[in-house]
Regions:
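C-terminal motif of bacterial Sec signal peptides marking the signal peptidase cleavage site
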Residues: 27-29
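Bacterial signal peptide processing site
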Residues: 31-34
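Post-signal peptide N-terminal segment of mature Sec-exported envelope proteins
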Residues: 37-59
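Noncatalytic modules at the cell exterior or secretory-pathway interfaces
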Residues: 60-67, 122-140
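Short amphipathic, basic-aromatic surface patches that mediate peripheral association
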Residues: 67-74
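Edge beta-strands of jelly-roll/beta-sandwich modules across compartments, strongly enriched
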Residues: 78, 140-151
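An anionic, turn-rich surface loop/hairpin at beta-sheet edges
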Residues: 97-125
Length: 155
């Protein structure tokens, strides 16, 4: 003789809800702590704007921004001056100049080095999509392979 299936008791239902809630919270918190957006540039001579577009992973918390430059042994200078233009989703625009002191490449010319410099700290993005940045060297430069932005959660 089989008995009819019983529905879970209120205590079991509550425990199942808690487990499901913990599972959903664990999935939601699995966002990467860092996001990087790069743009390749002509390594022979870079003299034109290089634009990136990004959607910040976290628009509620604060983020630290780092400018990232990948370069090879052809880069013989010790500084690089960039004009950085930023455009937010609501079309607010800001442009500024940033001087980077780049250490010499310690690798053979075909291999690349990467340099990362802090750009902004504790930035709060107002929206979660539609940001654009343009990096332009103030003079033609050789040996730069790509330029971009790293966004990481503030500590």
């Amino acid at each position: 003789v089989r008995s009819a299936p019983r529905s879970p008791t209120p205590r079991k239902r509550s425990a199942m809800r808690r487990r499901m809630l913990l599972f959903v919270l664990a999935l939601a918190s699995c966002r990467p702590a860092s996001q990087i957006v790069m743009r390749d540039v002509p390594a022979l001579t870079w003299d034109s704007p290089a634009g990136i577009a990004f959607d910040p992973a976290d628009s509620l918390g604060t983020s630290d921004l780092h400018v990232v430059v990948r370069y090879n042994g052809s880069f013989r200078e010790d500084t690089l001056t960039l004009r950085i233009a930023t455009c937010s989703p609501d079309s607010l625009r800001c442009e500024e100049t940033l001087l980077l002191r780049i250490p010499p490449a310690r690798t053979a010319a075909p291999l690349r080095s990467e340099y990362r410099i802090p750009y902004r700290r504790r930035v709060r993005f107002g929206r979660s999509a539609g940001y654009r940045m343009t990096f332009t060297p103030t003079r033609p430069v050789r040996g730069i392979e790509s330029v971009g932005l790293q966004i990481e959660k503030s500590r």
